[in-house]
């Protein structure tokens, strides 16, 4: 089997004024692989996510994406239209704040259905059936399909955002602190849901988090970032159980029983 | 009525007309795409058809014959004043007959009588942006048009069906033009939407306050958005016109007294009059 | 026959950056080879580095020096230099590890925890569950518990879940870290049977057994792990 990476980044560099936000970052994401980027606030992990997903243009380096057709596209040269098309079909983006990823005034069914309609679904009954199925999968009572997310709890909103993102079966999902604003008990449920869906659908995920426990639960591979650089990377359990870099040791030591 | 002196032909100066014609040409070249133009102050307030008037003024010539309708009627205030305006500043002949007109300026209707090649239908448009209630950021609506990213409009239709069991848009029903641009057909009843599809006449849309012109060239595909299992259906009152008996035309409901009495009449006065005249001719023969 | 797994001059030390860069050597020059169907018990005093060696073999700790050669997909592979993706493949197909403690995943039923490695290897979910259920039942975990997440289970029950998960796929190489530590006599006998059956099928086993009775029953030989001169 000739397997190739979905996303390949080489030598990414980006400065905000004098501050290096990214400094020589390279990484690959393979099909079905969950990669977590951990590091403290300001380490450049969110910037890296934005550069990899084409939202931000780097000063140096390149990001290549291999589409379902097998052709490789440079993420920063493909043009906004192609990037948007990618964003609503083959890619997904789960935001920390569900308000950034949902239409708060549109019903739960409409939120899930939007991505289907954006890629051409035109059968109301089919869209509704699919939305119902996805609400069930993310453990939202399908009877609430016509309620708006404003009437949902934070955890439900985040689960709805995940349903909306995954409904088009993307191959690559970017997640930015998906459990960020939630209570601990709600976090556990969400993490487990993500873990299950990712495994079932064989998704590749790039997860940005400062939650080491979440990274351990979800990620196959871990990248530790500090001051715009990847200081250590490898198998999740090895990086966390046998950290080599001083900063990783500090990070792991700071966590309560990860 | 004599032609007013002291004005250029059709009120606007030639440079302005040229500028507007350039916008119209661009609009015709990109069916359904909104082209900005330098909308002028007109001698009537915004919302009274300043966009349509500027378009008409830019394309009208001495040999044209103008018809103006408001909600289908030739005899309402807005229609009468615009017709008199052009009679005065351009000295062109006017008509109430759809078949005789070369230019028809309209507010909120498409005539029942099918238009033919060579005719031009000018719509007065209050809000040219079909996405404006869904996406408040103007820059973002432009981006959505550029990317043909219209999932949002379908979300609106989905929400309608979820809430009301059917698509509850009765006028200004969104259409796709030439399979590319989403377009607001101005507040015509959804009943009129099918008339836009592959119409032999040129359709021009002018929005004065919003400073936009757009167009549908002759024989261009115009499709009302819908779902496979909830297809678009033009709706009219289930009645016959009280005057001409038409069961095909779009009807206005007229309240006749204070006791709930009402009747249905054709909204298109020319069409209704023609049919009544034909009945009388038949009776006379 | 060539070994299923062997090490060449394997060494491992830890550098504690948070304690002024203190370096703790744990293993050096470890040469261990295990044939298919052979069970080797690691011996040595507590703190000698038995668990560290196991974790190095599994890739949970990075090898400091030397090589770890595993027969994987018909060829020898050096785990000491394998990247993360290759390591995942090795763990999925060739190398199993039963640790002392179950890492509980919230909300996942016991049955699915055991079935998961089977599904990852391509077995249909229902077949994987059936096999998991059979193994759990053999380990005397009542079927009423199969649908529950093991978070609230006793230590012994959790360990049996862990054992079922480790034995279910039939890895060619299996690492056992105190597999019977908190089990009663009946369950120890079951584990004994599992180990013997695995050996008979050609599984190479490396184990740490504090239970000398079990150790003497299953181990073909002992491998002495020598404590490094730590904190020198």
Give residue ranges: language-model regions.
Chain B
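General detector of N-terminal leader/presequence modules that precede the first folded domain
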Residues: 1-182
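A boundary/linker detector
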Residues: 162, 181, 185-216
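Short Cys/His-rich Zn2+-coordinating modules
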Residues: 217-231, 249-251
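Short cysteine-rich clusters marking metal-coordination/redox-active sites
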Residues: 241-245, 266
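Short Cys/His-rich "knuckle" micro-motifs
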Residues: 248-254, 274-277
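Short linker/helix segments within small regulatory modules
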Residues: 253-263
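Short metal-binding segments enriched for Cys and/or His
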Residues: 267-283
